[in-house]
Each structure stands twice: as structure tokens, then as C-alpha cells.
Regions:
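Short linear regulatory motifs enriched in tryptophan with gly/pro/ser
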Residues: 1-221
Length: 221
């Protein structure tokens, strides 16, 4: 189903909703303008980083002197945390510790990964886009996030999906068809019914949603 989906996100600066493919360039225009305005204000290094799992993505602006732990915590809060599992960053050629500074890891356009839960692992990828000199207060700023995906019920093929059955081919069901599926699948009401959420962790372990940007964490309207 993933290849049939299209992904788009809202720009934090102008609220324009754009396709995933053009969002990076669009955000760069805003960031370059802010960098020019902040040039005389003793700015600090901020890293524009894209986190993705296919059609799901986050655009982050992270203070260069912040530790990678800041990103780890943010990813858990918005996308991943369910049962207190362990997590960490990695790269095929070098180690990435949560104590490393963000600006040191993303000095170039490096691509690393982040794993959450070493049992039922959810892996996402992080890529450094560009560093900017900016005068900001926050350590991590959410520049954009994919809007809720248009997942459709597998049974009626009409209404937005609200739940997943984790034992029946991970099929999606709307609220109405979820009730019907309970009559067909004994495990659905017991443990296999999981909510549709805007996260790569959807349907895994006990994940039911994040704690940041919750208005974009549900079913598409």
C-alpha cells in the first residue's frame, strides 16, 4: 500500500502545504532569509535535519551544540515511545552516541539511522541537509511533518481507516467496519486492534500515539 500513498507537509513559517519532494527546498528559502536577518545578532549553528521512514517524515531544526540525546528524546515523544524501550543512533562506518554534539554528527550531509526497541525495532533515517547561523531559543524546532496519510478502509474501501488488525495481514478498518471485523476475528477486540496514528511505530507493540503535535497524529479528515 505504501507506494500508492502521497505525502505532504505544512511549512511552519508560512503554513503552505507542499509535497514531500519540494518541501526541503521551500524550507531552505525561509531559513536563508532568517539567517540573513540574524547575521548581526550573535547567531549559533542550527542544523536542518530530515527524518524519514518512506512517506512519513519530520523536518527538524536542531541547535548544533545540543547533544544527540535531544533528538532521541524528540523522536520518542513525537513518533516512538510506548513501553520505555531502549534506543540509539547508528551508522555503518562509525559510532553515534547520544552524547555527541549534533553539529559534529551532521557536519556534512551524512545519513544515519535511529533504532527504537531492539525487539520489535522501528528504524528511521536522519539526513543532514544544511547548517545555518540563527538566533533562536529552542533546541529542537519542528519545521514540518507529514500530514496524516490517506489510509482507506480495506473492507468498504470508502472511509478513512481508524484501526489496524495486527493478525489479519495488517488490514486497515474504518470505525464501522472495525465493529464488523470484531465478529470475524476473535483476536481483534482482545489484543490485535491498534489505532491508526501518524507514526512509523503504528501497529507495533503498545504504541498508540505521540505527545507532541498531537493534532496531526490521528486519522486524516
Amino acid at each position: 500500500m505504501e507506494h500508492e500513498l502521497t505525502s505532504e507537509g505544512k511549512c511552519v513559517f508560512c503554513s503552505q502545504i507542499l509535497p514531500q519532494a519540494t518541501l526541503t527546498k521551500h524550507l531552505a528559502t525561509h531559513l536563508a532569509k532568517i539567517e540573513k536577518e540574524d547575521a548581526s545578532k550573535s547567531p549559533e549553528t542550527y542544523c536542518h535535519i530530515v527524518v524519514d521512514d518512506g512517506v512519513m517524515f519530520l523536518h527538524l531544526l536542531v541547535k548544533g551544540k545540543a547533544s544527540m540525546k535531544k533528538i532521541d528524546t524528540f523522536l520518542k515523544d513525537i513518533w516512538l515511545e510506548c513501553c520505555g524501550h531502549m534506543s540509539g543512533f547508528g551508522h555503518k562506518d562509525f559510532k553515534v552516541s547520544t552524547t555527541h554534539l549534533v553539529m559534529d554528527v551532521f557536519e556534512t550531509k551524512v545519513k544515519i539511522y535511529h533504532d527504537y526497541d531492539y525487539g520489535s525495532t522501528t528504524r528511521v533515517f536522519l539526513k543532514g541537509i544544511k547548517n545555518y547561523k540563527l538566533k533562536l531559543k529552542e533546541d529542537v524546532i519542528l519545521l514540518s511533518r507529514n500530514e496524516p496519510l490517506k489510509l482507506i478502509c480495506a473492507k468498504c474501501e470508502k472511509h478513512p481507516a481508524a484501526n489496524i488488525c495486527t493478525v489479519c495481514d495488517w488490514d486497515f478498518f474504518c470505525e464501522s467496519c472495525s465493529g464488523k471485523h470484531e465478529q470475524e476475528c476473535d483476536d481483534f477486540e482482545d489484543y490485535a486492534k491498534m489505532p491508526v496514528v501518524n507514526s512509523p511505530r503504528m501497529g507495533v507493540c503498545g504504541y498508540t500515539g505521540g505527545h507532541i503535535d498531537t493534532e496531526r497524529d490521528g486519522v486524516h479528515q
